[in-house]
């Protein structure tokens, strides 16, 4: 299988459009300790997607039915 190299580059708008279309999840975790004593722990999960992408995901995993039944 050969790898093709292209000289075309993506613009920032194309990259943002692709991220919003597909969605991206950033999961971060950090811990600060001193002499074995934990001073600070940070956990973060950031989800970036368009509303349409999120609604497709929510429907696929059944989140929209739970919200409709609660109302």
From Swiss-Prot:
Q: Does the keyword Protein biosynthesis apply?
A: no
Q: What are the disulfide bonds? A: none
The protein, known as: Gas vesicle protein A
Per the record, which residues fall in region Beta-strand 1?
26-34
State the PANTHER family in the record. Answer: GAS VESICLE PROTEIN A1, GAS VESICLE STRUCTURAL PROTEIN 2-RELATED
Subcellular location per UniProt equals: Gas vesicle shell
- Gene name, per UniProt, is gvpA
Organism encoding this protein: Microcystis sp. (strain BC 84/1)
Alphabetized, the UniProt keywords read: Gas vesicle
Upper classification of the source organism reads:
Bacteria, Bacillati, Cyanobacteriota, Cyanophyceae, Oscillatoriophycideae
Region of interest (Alpha helix 2), ranges: 51-70
Q: Which family would the database say this protein is a member of?
A: Belongs to the gas vesicle GvpA family.
Q: Which region ranges are annotated with the description Beta-strand 2? A: 38-46
State the superkingdom.
Answer: Bacteria
Region Beta turn: start-end pairs: 35-37
């Amino acid at each position: 299988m050969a790898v093709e190299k292209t000289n075309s580059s993506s613009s920032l708008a194309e990259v943002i459009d692709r991220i919003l279309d597909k969605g991206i999840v950033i999961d971060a975790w950090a811990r600060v300790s001193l002499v074995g004593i934990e001073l600070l722990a940070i956990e973060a999960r950031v989800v970036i997607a368009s509303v349409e992408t999120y609604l497709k995901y929510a429907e696929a995993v059944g989140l929209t039915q739970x919200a409709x039944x609660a109302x």
